[in-house]
C-alpha cells in the first residue's frame, strides 16, 4: 500500500513539474516576431519568477517606451505590474490544468504574458480600452431582430476563416477610448463590402465617435445602434477622409465623401453556437459582445478559462476551426497587432467562452 501511494505521489509531482518545465522567462521581450509561431506547434507556458519583478518591469518600461515623472506613480505602477505577473502565472497554470482535465493537447492551451497593458489594473483596461455599453440596449433600433438557434440548415466545414478569402481588413487599435463598438461596427461593414465587391476598404470609426447621436463616443456604445446611425447619416466615409483621433471631436461629416451606404441591419439574439457558425458562414463576420476580463494578458493559443459575467467589449467573429480536437472561434479585436495572435484571439467553442452567447450580435447589409 505504501508503495502504491508513493507511485501516486510520484505521478502528481511529475505532472506538476511538467507544467513548470515550460519556463520561458526570457520571453518577457514579447512581440519580437511579426507573427506568432505555427499554431500547431507546442506553445511554451510563461512563468514569471516574482523575485525578478523589478528586472521585468524595467525591461517592460524600455520596450514600451514608458516612464513616470512622479516617484509615487512609478511605485504604484510597479506594484500593479507585480500583481499582473501573478495573475499571468495563475492564468497559464489554470489553462494548462483545464486542458489536462479535458484531455486536450497542451499545445493548444492559451498562453498569457506581459504586454502593453501590464502596468494597468484590469479595471483601468476595461474602463479605457473596451466600450460595450449595455445600458443603451433598450434604445429603439431600426435593425431587424432575429433569433439564432436550432440546428444548422446546411453542412458546415470544420474550419472556416474569412481572412482566407481576403474579406477581413487589417487589425486596428482603438487606443485609450471606449470605442470598441465603433470599431466592430466598421469592421463588419468593411467585411460586408469586401464580400459584396471583392475589395478591402478602410472606413472611418471617427465619424461614429463624432456624429453618432445615440452612442456615447469614447464612453461606450452598441454596434447595432452604430449601424442605425450610419443608416440615418447616409453612410460612412473612408479612414483617409475622416481619420481616427482617439477622442470625440466636432462632427465634420461630408455627404459628398460617403464611400459605403447601408441598406439595413440586423440584431441577433444568439442562443446556439452551431447556428452561429452558420450565420458567420452565410452572412459574413458578425459583431458580438464578450467579457474582456480574462483576455487582457492573452498572447496566443485557445483560451479555455474565461470570465463570462460582465459583457464589456465588442469584437468581430470571423471564423472557427479545430486544433488537436479542440474546437475554437476566431475573433478580431481592436487592440492593435501587438496584442494576442497579431491582434486576433481564439477561444474554445461550445462553452459560451467569454459570454459570447450572453447577449446579442449584429450585422449590416450594404449597398
Swiss-Prot record:
The keyword Protease applies. Synthesized as an inactive proenzyme and activated by proteolytic removal of the inhibitory propeptide. GO terms for biological process: proteolysis. The active site is at 180, 313, 333. The keyword Signal applies. InterPro entries: Papain-like_cys_pep_sf, Pept_asp_AS, Pept_his_AS, Peptidase_C1A, Peptidase_C1A_C, Peptidase_C1A_papain-like, Prot_inhib_I29. Residues 26-156 form a propeptide. Transmembrane segments: none annotated. It comes from the Viruses. It catalyses: Endopeptidase of broad specificity, hydrolyzing substrates of both cathepsin L and cathepsin B. Glycans are attached at residues 103, 135. Its EC number is 3.4.22.50. One of its GO terms (molecular function) is cysteine-type peptidase activity. Belongs to the peptidase C1 family. This is Viral cathepsin. It comes from Heliothis zea nuclear polyhedrosis virus.
